[in-house]
Every structure is written in structure tokens, then in C-alpha cells.
Amino acid sequence: MCKLFINAKSEMWASHTRSLRIDGMVTSVRLEDYFWRTIDEIAARDGMTAPQMLTRLYHESIDAGHDLGNFTSFLRVCCLRYMHLQLDGYIPRDKSVALGDLNAEKILAGESRIYH
């Protein structure tokens, strides 16, 4: 079992920092390359760049009343949820399907039945 993880390309867990501007303030986010690739994929599905999506995600999270004391951890969980929702069949693996076109309420209801 461990060989599957140990022998993966080490570039996947190499960390990289990207800077983005949120409300006029420059902030840096440091994530492993595998998470950045996932964020790029999520953003592209809705016709956005990663900085555009992260800014939007930040604002919508604040508007929803979330405490984003650790935005980087929040992003990692978002990436993992995205992949799990694909595996569970709630998000199509077809990258041409925009996430914004999906029925979020239905997906969240299905997810809550699985991960309660």
C-alpha cells in the first residue's frame, strides 16, 4: 500500500506560493503543487483564473459568515471535497461542465447524507 504513495512524484507535494490581491491587499497563499493544479482545474471549469476564483471564494465565504482564519486550510478542504464529490458522482468528471451550472443544493444534500 505505501509504495503507491511513497513512489509518487515528489513534485506533487512541493509547496509553491502564489500572490493575489483581495480588496486591494496583496496576500500570499502557499500550497502544495497538487492542490494548485486542482484549484486551477476548478477555476477553469467556470472560465476563471485561480486568482479570480480565490478572490470570489473568499468574498462569498465572508458573506456567508465563515471565519476564514486559515484560508489555506479552507482551500485544501475545498480541493479534497471537489475530488470526493467527483468520485461520489455528484460532480461530473467532464471538465467542460461548469461547476456554476450544477445544482449546489442537491449536491450538498447528497454530501450531507454521506458525510454526516
For each of these PLM feature ranges, what is it?
Residues 4-30:
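Short Lys/Arg-rich basic patches
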Residues 22, 28-74, 79:
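Amphipathic, hydrophobic secondary-structure cores in small proteins
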Residues 64-110:
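Short, positively charged interaction helices/loops
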Residues 112-116:
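Charged interaction scaffolds used for protein-protein
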